[in-house]
Amino acid sequence: MESSFEASKSLNENRDDIELIPTQSQGSPSLSSSSTITSTSRLGSNQVLIRIYFIDDTHKTLSIDPNNTTGDQLWEMVSEKLGINNRDSECFFVWAQNDEIEWLLFNHQNISEVIKNWGILKKRYCNTEENSPSSSTSSPILSGLSSIRGKKSNASSTSNANDGSGSGSGSGSGSGSGSGTSTPNSPKGGLSGFLTLGRKNKAQSPQLQSQSSSLSTTIASEHASKLRSSFPTLGEEGQFRLVYRPTSVLPLELERSINTAEATHLFYIQAIHNVINSNYPCEEDVALKLASIQLQVLVGDQKMEHQDHFKESISRYIPSHLLSKRKAEEWEQLVIPQHSLLRGSDSLQLKRAYLETCQRWAYYGSTFFKAKYIPANTSFFTQEFQGKVSIGINGNGFHIIDPKEMKMVSYSYRDIIAWDSTSNSFTIKFKIGQDKKFETKPYIFKTPQGELINDLISDWSEEWESKEKKNNKDSKKK
């Protein structure tokens, strides 16, 4: 594996280099505004250099024609460059990301269309201050429609994806069709360049590809690190980066079946990101174990000079919800001895050990959305959460996490009665108890990404229901 894909970043990778470099001024009008032009005979007239990032901020540089390179083709190029085979590569795809939100690219949309539509998507889903819901927010599932499960629209788009029109599943509808219930109105028209499902689509025929609608319905995740754009020469239009990382609907059994070094590394750095950013909140003893593994993988066997490195880079090793509880010297005294015990350990085995620890958590592999909890009543003492929380969605169910308080609540898909979304909120109702003797419990959240949460739950619900049917069928055969 090339050094730029390793956890340690080279000096060159930390520079604010030009990352999108038109080779001739007669290139794409939307991509040729840069005053910096690199002369290289190896690039075609319409080729540009872009950086594909990984979750740990390392990157690979590729040459593409943005007007004729699709998300699917870019995914294939990166997978090949990393040496990830066809089976393993199905677990990954390319995301468009800024510091507030991430979007899974649409398979067949050109990269130039992704750039063109990024501003629209950002405006729609990153505006967190306007139209804030109050605790009295009305929602269909809180108004007597508790028997309805929320679902994406199943309507097939017949519009051309290139014109950005249509109202297919990408429109982010709330409760499903077939329920006879209207949902909050979605903005008219799809948005080109972004995938409508939380997983990578199977290959489609050209006829189907030309009919797909186009709004991402998957990922929202805040990032503490400063954004490094894949297209800095485009100014505001290109203030996002392309990131190659796992898809959002990835069954844990499938992930565990993959053991190649390249794929394992991608899962490993994704887990580190979620641990350090407290998306995976853990107790101190577990955090120390994970930090020691990370340190051994990064710097090798313990040496005196590593102690200074650890203190200077402590925020890369200790989860954010624990960091302020001790001084850097105290963390050093706790981590370094455990690091010493790992002397001579194989890096790949350590990465797998790190993943195995994280995979025990119910919320492992979740897609996380930042939200504000809106209490259903005004009593301070009966409020389950206070203010900002993370909503996690994975194959196990729906998770509400407050890492500062180390408080987590999880519900399986069989517990979900209904869910609904608006442009600025998300509401979900669960059943508490067994059989006919159960109570209902609603949660209301302020978030501009309610439609995305809605659709991702739909994707995972379908996955869960399919698995349940298979298990029931297998049990009847016995």
Curated annotation (Swiss-Prot):
Pfam families, per the entry: FERM_M (PF00373), KRIT1_FRMD8_FERM_C (PF24522), RA_2 (PF21989)
Entries under CDD domains matching the protein: FERM_B-lobe
Highest taxon, organism lineage: Eukaryota
Residue ranges annotated for the FERM domain, each copy included: 48-468
InterPro entries assigned: Band_41_domain (IPR019749), FERM/acyl-CoA-bd_prot_sf (IPR014352), FERM_2 (IPR035963), FERM_central (IPR019748), FERM_domain (IPR000299), KRIT1/FRMD8 (IPR051594), PH-like_dom_sf (IPR011993), Ubiquitin-like_domsf (IPR029071)
One GO cellular component term: cytoskeleton
Composition skew (Gly residues), residue ranges: 165-179
GO biological process assignments: regulation of cell-substrate adhesion; regulation of sorocarp development
Compositionally biased tracts (Low complexity): 22-39, 129-164, 180-189, 204-216
Region (Disordered) location: 19-39, 129-196, 202-221
PANTHER family xref list: FERM DOMAIN-CONTAINING PROTEIN 8 (PTHR13283:SF10), KREV INTERACTION TRAPPED 1-RELATED (PTHR13283)
Name of the protein: FERM domain-containing protein B
Recorded name of the encoding gene: frmB
